Amino acid sequence: MSQSAQHHAINYIEFTTTDIAGTRAFYEKAFSWNFQDYGPEYIAFNKDQAGIDGGFRKGGPQQSQSDAAPLIVLYSQDLKATQDAIIAVGGSIVVPTFDFPGGKRFHFSDGQGNVLAVWSE
């Protein structure tokens, strides 16, 4: 994920796929995208080719459209302050902060049916 990210801006998009190898092959052949591997369950693409940094994570078959929805990821300079602001206006943390290669992130619900994530170094 980009180190020069703007605070609270959309910075990353994450999709779910049941077939990492097939997804990689499709986007490499269709759009000439290159990928970075993060193990057998995650591949990432970059904004130089795709217009935004993002990735595909391995997941099970989607049961509904909301299960298949991409995950929009915002950047924060201060995860704790951002969590506090979300909770203060009625949002909820649905996935607690966890480490991933490149930083930490959490997922939140805005109370209107949308789930987004926030990350930081």
For the regions a language model picked out, list residue spans one by one.
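N-terminal beta-strand motif that seeds the catalytic metal site of vicinal oxygen chelate
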Residues: M1-R24, G51-I52, P70-I72
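Conserved active-site tyrosine of GNAT-family acetyltransferases
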Residues: T23-Y27, I86, G113
